[in-house]
Structure formats: C-alpha cells, structure tokens
Amino acid sequence: TSKRLNNGFIRLGHNVLSISDRDITNNNKSINDFKGIKSLQNTVINNFKNFKPDLVVLGHADTLSLDTIDYIKDNNSKITQWFLDPVGNKSPDYKKNKARILDKSEHIDTSFITSDPKSLDFKIKNSFFMPNPSDSSFETLSNYRNDSEKDLFFAMSHGVHRGSLKKGKFDNREIFIKRLIKKNNNINFDIYGMNNIEPIWANQFITSLAKSS
C-alpha cells in the first residue's frame, strides 16, 4: 500500500522519502534497545530534521511513539495516517484495530480509512474514507480481456501475512460468502482462506487471481 501511495505522490510531482519502521526495528535490536524502538524514534527524528517535510504520512506505524509524533507536530509539519485494516464492530480483530487507529488520531491532523467513518460505532477525529489504493505498476492483470475459467475470486486469511488457517477460528465473512455461493449455482467460485482451503499469498495469489473474471 505504501508503495502505491508513494508512486502516486511522485507522479504528482512530490519529493518522497520512505522509511520502513519494520526494517529499522528489525535491524537495530540490541541489549539496550531490545525491540529496536528507540532506534526507530531517533531515525525518524533525524530524517525529519534533514528532509524537512511538509507532510508526514503514517501507515500502520504502531511502533512510532506519541512523543515522536508530537515532536513533528511541534515543528510545523502536518501528519496524516492511512489505515487499511477493518474497524467495523463485526470485523476481525475489531478491538485491536480500533485501539490502533485511535492511538494516534488525537495527535495528528487527519486519518484515512477503508471503512466509511459514518458506519462505525466510534468516532475518529478528522477521518475520511479512502478506497484501497491501486497502481498500474502493481495491478498488471487485464482479466476482462480473457475468457476466464473461474467467475469469481475471493481470498482471505486469519491475519495479515498469516500463511495458514487458525485452528478453531471463524471469520464472519464466511457467512456472506457461503450465502453467495448457495444462491448462485451458475457461478464458478474460486475461494481461499475458508472451508479448509489455506490462504494464498504472493505469486500464488496473482496466478489464481488471473484465472478469474
């Protein structure tokens, strides 16, 4: 997602500096900084001082501290965040995702989420709906040009980048998908992440998606 957004910013003529909190924390763990979080704060602040951005865009930056965010705000930069995980009260990990999106919302200028803010049972300050970003350099398939062997593709998982189903886990999305299948015998479905069919990722995801209309 961040690469798609960055590509868009660059195409619009903006200068973009990208920082991966995961890479920094993973590469800077030590006895004095067990999770690499201190190194992350220092890296972000030092880059902020050197780059002097007009806008700082956060994406699921859970390890960025509120002190670091307040430092950025105090130095006259705008801050926004995007959040793609579901935050509806019937969605997976509702309580966890709600806490994550609210953690920084009072300290930043705006939040962009893939759920309609009006549909939520809680309020996110200065929040706006955004669709899942797409970019022609990533979305390379043109399925509409082909006669596909499958009609409808759907894939989910029991957690971001989780490679297998959780034992005993039930996802409410299964209810809708099963109803859809039951009511549409004439549609050839290709479903992953439920009915004991494991989730798919990376090239396997693209290969399977390419077979559907």
Identify what each model region corresponds to.
Residues F48, K52-V56:
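Proline-aspartate-enriched helix->loop->beta-strand connector
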Residues L55-V57, T80, F112:
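Structural motif
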Residues Q81-Y94:
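A short, histidine- and acid-enriched strand-loop-helix "catalytic/donor-clamping" loop
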